[in-house]
A protein has these predicted regions:
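Alpha-helical transmembrane segments of multi-pass membrane proteins
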Residues: 31-45, 70-91, 114-115, 121
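Hydrophobic alpha-helical transmembrane segments of multi-pass integral membrane proteins
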Residues: 24-62, 69
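Cytoplasmic juxtamembrane regions at transmembrane-helix boundaries
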Residues: 8-32, 155-157
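Core transmembrane alpha-helical segments of multi-pass membrane transporters/permeases
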Residues: 1-16, 38, 42-43, 47
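Generic structural signal for well-ordered, non-membrane alpha-helical segments
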Residues: 11-15, 32, 52, 56-59, ...
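Juxtamembrane and boundary regions of transmembrane helices in multi-pass small-molecule transporters
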Residues: 88-157
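Re-entrant/interfacial helical elements at transmembrane boundaries that shape
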Residues: 16-20, 52-67, 94-110
Length: 157
């Protein structure tokens, strides 16, 4: 059995992860940072099987660091974190724990056939529409505000 030296594994800090993201030009402005934030929280939520509390606790500090670097207002950062974590990734029928729980609760009734994971996932309209609205706001800049010197929201940086 192989033994691993734990000291050889170095964990990356939030700042180091943000540095890695900001090395590429597309992520250096408000829109690019928001797209990076969207992809990051969505991937993290997928990894956690739709458990948003764990994904937001894991990726939240990284997202906060990304948003700070481009000056996005904290409300915008928080709304994007919560919104994208609870959007389309929750209805992925092959990963979301909520879809599996929903289908298992429909089994065992003689009066109706049990629902499949695609039926439950496909009926979660709120999550799908939330994703589209947030994606529209990221791409167009709708609602994007930056943080002023005293923390006040500014429409332009």
């Amino acid at each position: 059995m192989k033994k691993y030296d734990v000291q050889k594994f170095e964990l990356l800090s939030n700042e180091q992860i943000a540095d890695g993201i900001f090395e590429k030009p597309p992520w250096k402005d408000g829109r690019g940072a928001e797209i990076a934030m969207m992809l990051g929280i969505s991937l993290t939520t997928l990894i956690f099987g739709g458990v948003t509390s764990a994904s937001m606790a894991t990726f939240g500090k990284i997202q906060n660091e990304i948003g700070k670097r481009v000056g996005l207002h904290p409300y915008r950062r928080a709304n994007l974190l919560d919104g994208f974590a609870n959007a389309i990734v929750l209805v992925m029928p092959f990963l979301s724990v909520f879809v599996f729980i929903g289908t298992s609760l429909t089994e065992g009734y003689d009066m109706a056939e049990p629902l499949t994971v695609t039926q439950v996932g496909g009926s979660m309209f709120y999550s799908m529409m939330l994703f589209l609205v947030l994606l529209f706001s990221v791409v167009t800049g709708w609602g994007r505000q930056y943080e002023g010197e005293n923390g006040e929201p500014l429409n332009r940086k």
